[in-house]
Amino acid sequence: MDPRLQRLIDERDLRRLAELYAQGADRRDKALWSSIFTEDGLIEAPGIRLEGRANIVGALDAMATRYLATQHRVHNQVVQIDGDSAHGETYSTADHVAIGAEPRTVVTWSIRYQDRWRRVDGGWLFSERRLVIDWTETRRLD
């Protein structure tokens, strides 16, 4: 295959993982999240470090106890691919509606994910996601 075509396919596959991550987070879909991380995957966020696929997937239970709803959106993504590994940055915004907050509010996070991926058995998976939160905004819901 032409290397330029392979690069386009790889870039699309990496972006698709970011989109599936967002969908899995918002639907609290453990099977989906399990399918997009390596067994030794890592998520880091301010005050949080989750190591291993089981711990990452388990974080969805914690999200369900804190947030009535979330909505993650994937924006631009820049990646560097080197054979069967890749790294890059994925921009995102995520809305979080807290359980029990009165008045009801939504907190928006502006996120830059520092991502690493590995190709495993012919398909790409996240090996690391490090969240950098650039800013937050809290607003009341009507």
Q: Which functions belong to the PLM regions below?
A:
Residues 1-27, 31-35, 39:
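Short, low-complexity N-terminal intrinsically disordered segments enriched in polar/charged residues
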Residues 87, 109-140:
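Short beta-strand edge/turn micro-motifs at domain boundaries
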Residues 100-107:
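Short, surface-exposed loop/helix-turn segments at secondary-structure junctions
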